[in-house]
């Protein structure tokens, strides 16, 4: 096939420009590998797709393509039994939101059957799952109290117990009989336990468990006996909290695995290609 004309047309620069706006690696690679078609029918069909997208761009404005790169791999891992993290589930929710945006964009104006119909109809938004994930997970390292009734109840117990401990210890550090043994009148945390800083020479005057010693050895951090049981309850609640978070992640991961084929987003790749061509 004669290709010298491609250099004259600077096709490589045109394709590179079109690829700049691709939202995922696969669609970018597919577009960069694009070669001129010899089959007139394929050329005609590709032009019809580009014309259809261009017409919709004029009517509806630009669609919002969000990042979806890597989501198919996450879904595949979910199918194999891997548990997705909070950050990974937020990526999944973002992809689902992207699918919904594209479907809404495509249907925002009336039109007859188009050669791009199959591409957009192949997208299957899951607004329920997307909203559940977005409501339950606030950030890659933060799950909302309202993610489940059990989680909400555990966190209320943790906060109530922590407040009770702080009140007791703050009362202790303000007490004249006790404060004279302290390096300073503060309450801190060591190894997940609330402690007070006791002067080393008075370590025997404050009954409790030593959890840490300052670098100089002048201060020992003591968990007073009065709050040992409450501190233990907090650790128990924290362990139950971690178990509940894991249970929620497993449940969401199972829902992602159930719709794994939709995350292969081959349709999104094909949508991206004629859309980027229409911008040239």
Q: Each predicted region: which residue ranges?
A:
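Internal alpha/beta scaffold segment
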Residues: 225-251
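Signal for well-folded cores of large energy- and translation-related assemblies
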Residues: 19, 76, 138, 166, ...
């Amino acid at each position: 096939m004669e290709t010298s004309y491609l250099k004259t047309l600077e096709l490589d620069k045109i394709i590179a420009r079109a690829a700049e706006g691709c939202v995922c690696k696969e669609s970018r690679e597919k577009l960069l590998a694009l070669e001129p078609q010899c089959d007139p029918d394929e050329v005609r069909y590709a032009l019809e797709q580009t014309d259809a997208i261009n017409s919709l761009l004029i009517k509806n404005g630009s669609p919002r393509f969000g990042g979806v790169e890597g989501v198919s791999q996450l879904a595949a891992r979910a199918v194999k039994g891997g548990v997705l993290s909070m950050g990974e589930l937020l990526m999944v929710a973002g992809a689902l939101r992207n699918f919904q945006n594209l479907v809404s964009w495509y249907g925002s104006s009336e039109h007859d059957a188009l050669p791009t119909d199959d591409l957009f109809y192949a997208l299957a938004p899951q607004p329920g799952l997307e909203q559940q994930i977005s409501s339950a997970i606030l950030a890659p390292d933060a799950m909302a109290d309202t993610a489940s009734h059990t989680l909400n109840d555990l966190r209320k117990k943790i906060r109530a117990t922590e407040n009770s401990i702080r009140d007791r210890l703050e009362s202790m550090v303000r007490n004249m009989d006790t404060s004279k043994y302290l390096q300073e009148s503060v309450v801190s945390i060591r190894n997940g336990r609330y402690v007070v800083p006791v002067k080393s020479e008075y370590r025997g005057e404050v009954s409790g468990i030593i959890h840490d010693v300052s670098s100089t050895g002048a201060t020992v951090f003591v968990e007073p006996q009065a709050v040992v049981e409450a501190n233990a309850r907090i650790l128990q609640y924290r362990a139950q909290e971690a178990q509940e978070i894991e249970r929620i992640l497993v449940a969401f991961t199972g829902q992602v695995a159930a719709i794994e084929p939709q995350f292969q987003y081959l349709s999104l790749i094909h949508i991206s290609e004629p859309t980027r061509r229409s911008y040239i």
